[in-house]
Design a protein with these regions (language model features):
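Hydrophobic residues on short alpha-helical segments
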Residues: 506-511, 590-597, 622, 651
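Short helix-coil-helix linker/hinge
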Residues: 502-505, 584-590
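Short, amphipathic alpha-helical interaction segments positioned at domain boundaries
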Residues: 562-587, 645-660
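Membrane-embedded helix-loop-helix hairpins and adjacent transmembrane boundary segments
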Residues: 1-555, 564, 578
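Short amphipathic alpha-helical interaction segments
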Residues: 528-543, 612-628, 638
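Short acidic, hydrophobic short linear motifs in intrinsically disordered regions
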Residues: 516-527, 600-612
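Short, Lys/Arg-rich nucleic-acid/phosphate-binding segment
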Residues: 551-560, 635-641
Length: 660
């Protein structure tokens, strides 16, 4: 089995690296490397989310929950909480993340709060995602060590080297292409494993009769029952906080996944389908496999046994599963590890690159410099992730430690979306206090062993409530942003608007709103700027009364229309431009790109290249044409633009304005 496994792993890694090399041709600039040009469709994103959910760490984490606390804790406390979290996240943030123009969680929080908040959140997100990366690699390292007899240090190191090489090659394009292969392999492997043990030993009645505890559903092998509302970890309350809220709402790579979608609807629907259907189908077999291992080998995995949940799957594979199936499952385990770890690796790379390197260290860097820096950053992040593999407590506590840092970030996300009165100072001090308490808790508890707060309250609860209480109290005693002030109205009111001089950049932003409703993402992507620049301009235009937000809450807060006074300060359009605006709500350039697409998708790309449009410049116009109902975006991964009947009518009506 050893020889067959090594050969299969080498072949698999060679195929994945080859796929990454193939996808490299799609990377045109730094935005392509990190966002894949915002081109992914529904099926592609569902498969991506499944690949992220089907993490290699689950092969040790889920069986550990089963053996320590029973099936209910693993299935309800983790799997169902995670699935529900996907659904809620998709509903609340699917359109918001895609429409606000930011690329990272930290960047989004700057456009709502301040640059200081962005820096704090960038640090917290980086720590979290490095911990999650390490957790996934450590899990697969444990399984390979147990099954093949290799030292854990060697297996963990080999996995990290492979992931770093693979991820550095082609960014999100390569990760996505290979993820679609890997989720199929991993899904078949783990569903097949659960089905195999049930077919061989019997159904759930056999499991209940042989599991080394009186109640396989409620009680672990040592007789431990998971509390419901305890503030310690794990309880159903802390499990829910970590895996339904924090890991999603505060994590950058879930935010990135929404930003790679063609539109917010694709993001929302893909999260909902994954959470409702795919996560239970993919993850419950892993929980059952862990439970069956303890039932088959009660002496080894029972209360007096020497083995635990982290070794359960590897032990089951070695003792009960035929060699060909073992090799396939090993490849599946490696596949999902590479998938999730590479996604979290690029998530933290994007945070450090965009929120620290481009903003603080090298704000004037060009595309080539940013792309080069991203690869160096990814390598450094990989090294730190490798070191975190040796965090005390194993996969369960490493996962809990990593996700607990997301508590303050999740609070800021919630308040940013639904409470305009939450102030910049409240966000900063809430996040800072939460992170300081988390740091002290980790230092004095896990590192120095002086005082372990986890004996009383888990770090996730500590971070959540400290950030919430401090943030709310400070907000009540500090001045909010203008739109949170009493008396501010969404619709322009002369008593609350103040005219200010406009820069050339402000006029460019305002001009983009004159052709009908437009999103912050379309403005930011088209102008090729950081969203803090577009945010500053939009806020100035709003305070002048030149634009109108569609709503004061959620994603429509980042949808804008021009007002009559805004139209008045712009230079008048030509007769042809005015006709095009009245008939189609398009600028001349937008119409010409539509006309180019009417010939063929390839012709549209030539049109964009001739005007030196980057990946996101193109996406901004295509997104707007999609919103207007003039095009459809098809294709599994790479986008293909096809005109609708309405789009063809517009082109035919104004064909004299087309240049191609």
């Amino acid at each position: 089995m050893l020889t067959a496994s090594i050969i299969a792993i080498v072949i698999y890694l060679a195929i994945m690296i080859g796929a990454g090399a193939y996808a490299k041709r799609w990377v045109n600039d730094a935005d392509d490397y990190m966002l894949a040009g915002r081109e992914f469709g529904f099926v592609c994103n569902v498969m991506e989310l499944c690949a992220v959910a089907l993490a290699g760490s689950l092969l040790t984490f889920v069986p550990t929950l089963v053996l320590d606390y029973g099936l209910k804790t693993a299935i309800i406390g983790y799997i169902c909480m995670l699935g529900l979290g996907y659904c809620v996240y998709g509903i609340l943030y699917g359109k918001l993340a895609r429409d606000n123009g930011s690329q990272t969680v930290a960047e989004y929080l700057e456009i709502r709060y301040s640059s200081k908040v962005r820096t704090l959140v960038a640090i917290a997100s980086s720590i979290t995602m490095m911990g999650i990366t390490a957790n996934n690699v450590l899990a697969i390292g444990n399984i390979f060590s147990e099954l093949l007899g290799f030292p854990q240090l060697l297996t963990v190191s080999i996995c990290f080297i492979a992931i770093i090489i693979f991820s550095m090659m082609s960014g999100f394009w390569g990760i996505t292409l290979t993820d679609m292969i890997q989720v199929v392999i991993g899904g078949i492997a783990f569903i097949g494993l659960g089905a195999f043990v049930m077919a061989k030993f019997g159904g759930l009645d056999w499991l209940a009769a042989n599991f080394p505890s009186p109640d396989v559903w409620n009680v672990g092998v040592t007789g431990t029952v998971t509390p419901v509302l305890s503030l310690r970890y794990p309880s159903f309350f802390t499990l829910g906080l970590n895996y339904m809220v924090f890991i999603l709402w505060g994590s950058n790579y879930y935010f990135l996944r929404l930003n790679t979608c063609r539109n917010g609807k694709v993001g929302r629907n893909s999260y909902m389908l994954t959470g409702l259907i795919m996560i239970p189908i993919l993850l419950i077999p892993i929980a059952l496999a862990g439970a069956y291992t303890a039932a088959i080998y009660p002496e080894q995995f029972g209360a007096d046994g020497t083995l635990g949940g982290a070794q359960a799957i590897a032990y089951l594979l070695r003792e009960q599963i035929p060699t060909p199936l073992v090799v396939f499952i090993l490849i599946g385990a490696l596949a999902v590890t590479v998938s999730t770890a590479s996604t979290s690796l690029i998530g933290v790379t994007s945070t450090i690159s965009r929120d620290i390197y481009q903003r603080l260290l090298r704000p004037s860097s060009n595309t080539e410099q940013v792309l080069k820096a991203q690869k160096y950053i990814m390598f450094g992040v990989g090294i730190v992730g490798w070191l975190l593999c040796f965090y005390p407590g194993g996969t369960v506590f490493l996962f809990g430690f990593a996700t607990s840092w997301l508590g303050p970030v999740a609070i800021l996300m919630i308040m940013a979306s639904f409470w305009p009165r939450f102030t910049n100072q409240g966000a900063f001090w809430g996040a800072l206090v939460g992170m300081v308490l988390l740091t002290l808790s980790t230092l004095f508890g896990d590192v120095l062993g002086i005082f372990n707060t986890s004996n009383y309250v888990h770090a996730s609860v500590l971070g959540l409530f400290s950030a919430l209480v401090v943030g709310v109290v400070v907000s009540l005693f500090t001045k909010p942003n203008y739109y949170g002030e009493r008396g501010w109205t969404r619709l322009p009111d002369p008593s609350s608007r103040t005219v200010q001089p406009l820069t050339d950049f402000d006029k460019k932003v305002l001009a983009m709103t004159r052709y009908g409703r437009i999103t912050m993402a379309e403005i930011t992507d088209y102008l090729g700027c950081d969203s803090r620049e577009s945010k500053a301009s939009v806020e100035k235009l709003d305070r002048c009364g030149y634009i109108v937000r569609a709503s004061m809450y959620s994603y429509k807060f980042y949808h804008f229309d021009i007002s009559k006074s805004g139209e008045a300060v712009l230079a008048p359009l030509s007769e042809a431009e005015q006709t095009l605006k009245a008939d189609a709500q398009l600028s001349l350039e937008q119409f010409q790109m539509l006309a180019a697409a009417a010939v063929s998708h390839e012709n549209m790309l030539k049109f964009a290249a001739a005007r030196h449009m980057g990946s996101l410049n193109q996406t901004a116009i295509i997104s707007l044409l999609d919103h207007r109902g003039y095009v459809k975006q098809t294709g599994l991964m790479k986008r293909k633009v096809v005109l609708t009947d309405a789009g063809r009518r517009v082109v035919e009506s104004h064909k004299t304005l087309a240049t191609v």
